Amino acid sequence: MTSVVVVGTQWGDEGKGKITDFLSADAEVIARYQGGDNAGHTIVIDGKKFKLHLIPSGIFFPEKISVIGNGVVVNPKSLVKELAYLHEEGITTDNLRISDRAHVILPYHIKLDQLQEDAKGDNKIGTTIKGIGPAYMDKAARVGIRIADLLDKEIFAERLRINLAEKNRLFEKMYDSEALDFDSIFEEYYAYGQEIKKYVTDTSVILNDALDAGKRVLFEGAQGVMLDIDQGTYPFVTSSNPVAGGVTIGSGVGPSKINKVVGVCKAYTSRVGDGPFPTELFDEVGDRIREVGHEYGTTTGRPRRVGWFDSVVMRHSRRVSGITNLSLNSIDVLSGLDTVKICVAYDLDGERIDYYPASLEQLKRCKPIYEELPGWSEDITGVRSLDDLPENARNYVRRVSELVGVRISTFSVGPGREQTNILESVWANI
């Protein structure tokens, strides 16, 4: 029994897709356990970029099984489009498996997402308008439509009719918006269901059988710990649990079968959407990091907010997700800066604190306390070992590890697979 979970430790966009793709080389099964097509990940193979939103990164290994678990909310339209994109690029998807228990995102979820966000005005959350939140709402309210329902023509029609009638009353009466048409949704989405039918199965059985057989299973999280609905900057969060504990619920695998948790982070911090961000930069340094790091959302295309590395956030993520290993990405983006900073604690009303407050009002008053380190000017994109890094960059990496309290297993100096450097194998000693 060998399993590793990959989680984002910040607000998403840490490079999880790249690290998952890298670790997938030694895995036999790769599974997603939460989120939907609101999460974007970019994988670079032989210099070519592939952007995925729903399908696991392991799809690029045809001999390995890629799983979309029951905790994922699936937009069939997006899934079919993504499958077509991969097929056009010559990538086989015969190794994909989709949970029959996963819930389905339908057009009324997306419409409701937009209407709710618009109604919030200045208090908007910054949702990607992908229908993720409303789909999880239906799931919790026990009125959601699952993949198993989508494949059954009569059941899908019955449940869609009931749900759409309720949603249309909401659109017309509360939001003064037009109703959606049952026939067009039913025909379009039932057809999508038939297209993906061959991939659908009980993925919990596949995952548990693989683990019981001693195979290596890699679980891929979406978003990041600070977007977790319980442990993140609520309400500026996603509607699921990206923390490692979400694996057990979203994949149907018990907690006793999880061995290691790899926390992925960047050498700085970024965030898309609204919400607290104590180390955010508004100066030319922030602009430089954004441009050099190409900090624009994979899903939204929106410029990401950027800031210095925040060890308070990282220690929070380590604690609530049980992180055992750290993967530090994008060190190269900081090259050329005379000074680099790390937030070591916060000043809250004159008091030094080293924890991340739950209160948004307190977070607004938190001022980062920085430790300054000398920067480096060298181009490090070709570095292939820790010893090859300039001394100042090497000291920065070590200081990050010390402050977070987790050993670094890999570090990256660029987007390519070959730019990921291994300090220790996360698959070893399991």
Curated annotation (Swiss-Prot):
Residues binding Mg(2+), per UniProt: D13, G40
What catalytic reaction does the record list? IMP + L-aspartate + GTP = N(6)-(1,2-dicarboxyethyl)-AMP + GDP + phosphate + 2 H(+)
What SUPFAM superfamilies is this protein classified in?
A: P-loop containing nucleoside triphosphate hydrolases
What this protein needs as a cofactor is: Mg(2+)
Q: Which UniProt keywords apply?
A: Cytoplasm, GTP-binding, Ligase, Magnesium, Metal-binding, Nucleotide-binding, Purine biosynthesis
SMART domains (alphabetical): Adenylsucc_synt
The UniProt note on the cofactor reads as follows: Binds 1 Mg(2+) ion per subunit.
Q: Name one GO cellular component term.
A: cytoplasm
The EC number(s) given in the record are 6.3.4.4
Q: Where in the cell does this protein reside?
A: Cytoplasm
In which residues is IMP bound?
D13, E14, G15, K16, N38, A39, G40, H41, T128, R142, Q223, T238, R302
Give any GO molecular function from the UniProt entry.
Answer: magnesium ion binding
The record's section on InterPro entries has:
Adenylosuccin_syn_GTP-bd (IPR018220), Adenylosuccin_syn_Lys_AS (IPR033128), Adenylosuccinate_synth_dom1 (IPR042109), Adenylosuccinate_synth_dom2 (IPR042110), Adenylosuccinate_synth_dom3 (IPR042111), Adenylosuccinate_synthetase (IPR001114), P-loop_NTPase (IPR027417)
Residues binding substrate are T298, T299, T300, G301, R302, P303, R304
Annotated GO biological processes are:
'de novo' AMP biosynthetic process; IMP metabolic process
Q: Where is the active site?
A: D13 (proton acceptor), H41 (proton donor)
Q: Where does this protein hold GTP?
A: 12-18, 40-42, 304, 330-332, 412-414
NCBIfam families, per the entry: PRK01117.1, purA
Record note on quaternary structure: Homodimer.
Function (record text): Plays an important role in the de novo pathway of purine nucleotide biosynthesis. Catalyzes the first committed step in the biosynthesis of AMP from IMP.
Q: State the protein's name.
A: Adenylosuccinate synthetase
Organism equals: Streptococcus uberis (strain ATCC BAA-854 / 0140J)
Q: What is the lineage of its organism?
A: Bacteria, Bacillati, Bacillota, Bacilli, Lactobacillales
- The gene name on file is purA
